[in-house]
């Protein structure tokens, strides 16, 4: 019997949510009695796009090259996102599945735009302005004519980046892909729980409603599996990427860089030149230098950041150099420094005063709760699975999130590359 695998990543679901989830009908029908990991250790930064790339590559950000949601561009008040798969530097589970002869699908899985080895693709993306259309937007990100016809069918329920409308859309698109094409590997990423935490806090009635919605999403997908006659051969994995922590303020550190002369503005308050720039990742931030080889600017920036950290009022608990974050947290890239939150501050990008701001729920980084912090902080992500590849009623202890890709691969009968960072959770598999 050829097995199939569905990965449903419920963004920002945490272990504390499972007590409610386990009372709900679709968990009981499709996941109860399977396997569960007590503690999944995620990556740094605890941000959706880097984590999901680690989930499918089995590698840390220093290898796969995704270390934030955004495609860094200086001077923009709204940064573009890293939607396209071209940013990923390592083979992922979709690449290896195709090499093994499997069919593949992904719906709203991060950083999969124009992925050549996903047969049925609906990238996490949205129209880029009032002139753009849903059809053209998803076509631009690699959706095939067959998938575009499904997207067109459900467009009326798609609310751009507004939850749960966009989640209802993606779940129905995924369900139709199951019934029409029966992919061997399907990865899905609803983000309703994540959005509710950003908007209302880590543990609130709205978050509980999101857990109930997620159970219903499981039911919609698995009903499609049953209608396709595939239940006995399908493995379902419910995972997540990170938790969140409540914060009390947002702090715009680029204001301090302007005051230090490291960012220079024109008469309209826009950036005309820069030496250093702080890009928020929510509860952490990356600091870029225009010329990383300029030792004078590097030292000036480091001295400023160390001073802000030492004062204890600017939201920074630790300043990492790129070399330190690469060595200690496997976070490396073309930035020069990483700033870690003090546990109650989130960072924002603005270079204009005021320095300290209240919540702005239009940006995931500046809501009532956020993430991006070191992976040992806050509530932790989940891993549950049930199906013919997995043991029954088995619990395991701590695993790094990079162990998920090789585990998924083994469940489908193939291997990830030898030089990945993760190892399969063999104790969970039959």
What are these regions (language model features)?
Residues 2-16, 29-30, 55, 97, ...:
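Beta-strand elements within well-structured catalytic alpha/beta cores of enzymes
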Residues 3, 24-25, 50, 88-95, ...:
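A structural signal for well-ordered alpha-helical segments within the folded catalytic domains
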Residues 15-17, 49, 112-119, 194-198, ...:
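Short catalytic/ligand-binding loop motif for oxyanion handling, primarily in non-cytosolic enzymes
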Residues 18-62, 105:
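Short, structured active-site-proximal loop/turn typified by the sulfatase FGly-forming signature C/S-X-P-X-R
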Residues 39, 103-108, 185-189, 238, ...:
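A structural signal for short, well-ordered beta-strand segments and their strand-loop junctions
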Residues 60-201, 289, 300, 306-310, ...:
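His/Asp/Glu-rich, glycine-adjacent segments
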Residues 71, 75-86, 90, 95, ...:
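Secreted, luminal/periplasmic, and some membrane-associated catalytic domains
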Residues 262, 266-296, 366-411:
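Substrate-binding rim/cap in mid-to-C-terminal beta-strand-loop elements of soluble/periplasmic
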